Amino acid sequence: HAIIRKLLESPKVERIYCAPGNGGISCDAQCVDINAMDKDSMVTFAKQNGIDFAVVAPDDPLAAGMVDAMEEAGIPAFGPTANAAVIESSKVFSKNLMKQYGIPTAGYEVFDDSASAIAYIEQNNTFPIVVKADGLALGKGVIIAENLQAAKDAVQSIMEDKIFGQSGNKIVVEEFITGPEVSVLAFTDGKTLKPMVSSKDHKRALDNDKGL
């Protein structure tokens, strides 16, 4: 909604459609009943309504290639392609990328079966420890385990019970580090970088750092 409000300030913007949108957004844009993951329907709507520019914001359609689909249809789109979005959609990829290029990151190991993950956690025997689903999980794919049993339960729930679906086919078992978390985002066209102001995301669902 904030993006839509800002775009409306531009004299170049005549009309904005949002799919699927919500009650609040309907005050500023025309909401369209299309699933955000439905690339074919989204492209068809854009063509039929003479859309000049598409802004793809959510993680899931970015990872699924919505920007790619729009650009293939000749519609300029803002957002990373599926290949670029993998740095967000796969924690395994992003951790390995940081390791490859010497970018400081918490120590970690990657596992694709629960038995190996639990064996490593038992051998490591250091807590708290962090268990992360590889794929997208609506921001809830990270579990901080305070003890061995909690770590085993986390591995079981992610890899065997599939609480995050296929996003839990692989996991990252990561060193727990403390300190303030800061998000720094930037806009880029591949040549120029324009940083935004820093921000802090409150990860827990409940007060007093409780919940996932």
Describe the role of every protein-language-model region.
Residues 1-82, 115:
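ATP-binding N-terminal substructure of ATP-dependent carboxylate-amine bond-forming enzymes
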Residues 18-19, 55-56, 77-80, 107-110, ...:
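General beta-strand structural signal in soluble alpha/beta enzymes
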Residues 27-29, 43, 86-92, 206-208:
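Short, charged, surface-exposed secondary-structure boundary motifs
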Residues 78-141:
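A conserved helix-loop-beta module that forms one wall/lid of the active-site cleft
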Residues 104-107, 126-130, 145-183, 187, ...:
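Conserved ATP-binding module of the ATP-grasp superfamily
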